[in-house]
Swiss-Prot record:
CDD domains: CLECT. Keywords: Calcium, Disulfide bond, Glycoprotein, Hemagglutinin, Lectin, Metal-binding, Secreted, Signal. The lineage of its organism: Eukaryota, Metazoa, Ecdysozoa, Arthropoda, Hexapoda. Disulfide bonds join 140-160. One of its GO terms (biological process) is melanization defense response. One of its GO terms (cellular component) is external side of plasma membrane. It comes from Drosophila melanogaster. It is found in: Secreted. This is C-type lectin 37Da. Galactose-specific lectin that displays calcium-dependent activity. Binds to the surface of hemocytes and enhances hemocyte encapsulation and melanization. This is likely by interacting with carbohydrates on the surface of the hemocytes. Also displays agglutination activity against the Gram-negative bacterium E.coli.
Length: 186
């Protein structure tokens, strides 16, 4: 998509008076291969991704909206390593709060997907006997120390809306960085 937009811009700009180029090429690389300084405030880099840890306790929908305002998404744990890195970061800060993720089964009860990328939730970090859709109303996934005896962060399903026991902090994940190079021959 980004490459198409850049190419479209160059084509349109090529018709502007005094801005005609004979030849150009674009190249898009994942990440920041030249370690350019990029201000990612308020995001925090953990491994190769950037996150914001929302401090207000809100329902899942408000958490999603807050992340979108930052042009990011609720966190999606694509690997167990990513989950473990976030859990380690929170533990290092002494933060045992519960946090919303993008996971839910709003589309089909019992089948949990990451809302951000439409992939099945496959990581094995559920709390014991979870997800359970207690009362037929738990559809959004959060992470936290789920039970009083829990010794680590785990996943659990909770009601998405303003249920008194379902107002949590949230974690936003920035989109993956891409570096766009444009070479123009005049």
């Amino acid at each position: 998509m980004l490459k198409t937009l850049v190419q479209l811009f160059l084509v349109v700009a090529g018709f502007a008076p005094g801005f005609g180029y004979d030849k150009y090429t674009t190249h898009i690389q994942n990440g920041n291969p030249y370690n350019l300084t990029v201000d990612m405030t308020p995001f925090i880099k953990i491994n190769e991704s950037y996150y914001v840890f929302g401090q207000t306790k809100v329902n899942w929908y408000v958490a999603y909206e807050n992340c979108r305002r930052l042009q990011s998404e609720l966190v999606t744990f694509e690997t167990a390593e990513e989950f473990d890195a976030i859990a380690a970061f929170l533990n290092a800060r002494g933060d045992r709060s519960e946090h919303w993720t993008s996971g839910n089964d709003l589309g089909k009860t019992g089948t949990h997907y990451w809302f951000s990328n439409a992939q099945l939730v496959t990581i094995k970090r559920w709390a014991p006997k979870q997800p359970d859709n207690a009362g037929g109303r738990e559809h959004c996934i959060h992470l936290g120390y789920i039970y009083g005896y829990s010794t680590e962060f785990q996943l659990n399903d909770r009601p998405c809306h303003n249920h008194a026991s379902s107002l949590f902090k949230y974690i936003c994940e920035a989109p993956k960085q891409e570096t766009v190079s444009i070479v123009v021959w005049k």
